[in-house]
């Protein structure tokens, strides 16, 4: 069964009578009318009028559930279940005190299903797509083994480490992107505002301008005339590529492999993918999910099409009876150190421990690379800014220097 996509929030305005016979009214953010009726019923309010309205963009963004919210929920459930709090009570405690309406609605739906006798894993799968295949499969394993607190503890640790890794990767991508954008912005302002002023001054010289200055002036003319069209073309190309990626597996695969070849950033992306693969597989396998099922789930959550393809190949070869480390070697996607540790794990019967160690090593390497990214990129940034911005400045002052030498 596929996870149900979470319904959008709606704003319900209601009027009714409370247990004291007094007229009351209010509004409530919820994903369904049934949820509103259930909540008002719990408050002993008899509904007289209920009207559905739209939700503002600000409210929708404020109350939207993010991956981090699911991670925090998982940690809260792990803590409460470990201390002996029943699952229904734990769900109610988190739901009643959560500030996001969408999360309240999701937890209310799960709680209602569990109280009606539905297994927690099935209730989560039905309630929201935020609970992915890995999450639901692990919860189901915990239910079958009677060890739900430990499973939630594993899930919480796994998600926390995944969130930290994702934040590091985003940081690695943002820094160079911001530098390039700033350089382009400064160059655009110079070409459209500063250089035209210099050009007006040059017209009074009555002499031929240096070749380099002429080329920069031509570039300035082009940017002033066609920058809007260039921006539209670039935006169209980006949206077109996104559409192609969405509809074509081969395009997704090629762009993923291209991204892994970028200097420094590609290395971070590759190590992050290997760390996530190792951590996900270790978490699934340690929870009691068979290795083949774990591989299948891990492929779906890899976050990179190149590694997803490689993991699917590992799954097929392992299902055919090949040792996993050999199947991994055949994909040519994993470093030798990873293969050696997986081989030791398979032969010693401690595969989950070795995979966790691989994940720890690569998470540390990602942390180290991102933390030192400024030092690594600083020389490149200086050269880039010096070439782009400095080149424009030099081009503008060359005629002045030439004029001064003639006058001298």
From Swiss-Prot:
Membrane-traversing stretches: 178-198, 221-241, 381-401
Cell compartment(s), UniProt: Cell inner membrane
Keywords: Cell inner membrane, Cell membrane, Fimbrium biogenesis, Membrane, Protein transport, Transmembrane, Transmembrane helix, Transport
Single GO cellular component term: plasma membrane
GO BP annotations listed: protein secretion by the type II secretion system
Bilayer disposition of the protein: Multi-pass membrane protein
Pfam (any one): T2SSF
Family, as annotated: Belongs to the GSP F family.
Function: Involved in the translocation of the type IV pilin.
Protein name, entry field: Type IV pilin assembly protein PilC
Source organism: Vibrio cholerae serotype O1 (strain ATCC 39315 / El Tor Inaba N16961)
Species lineage: Bacteria, Pseudomonadati, Pseudomonadota, Gammaproteobacteria, Vibrionales
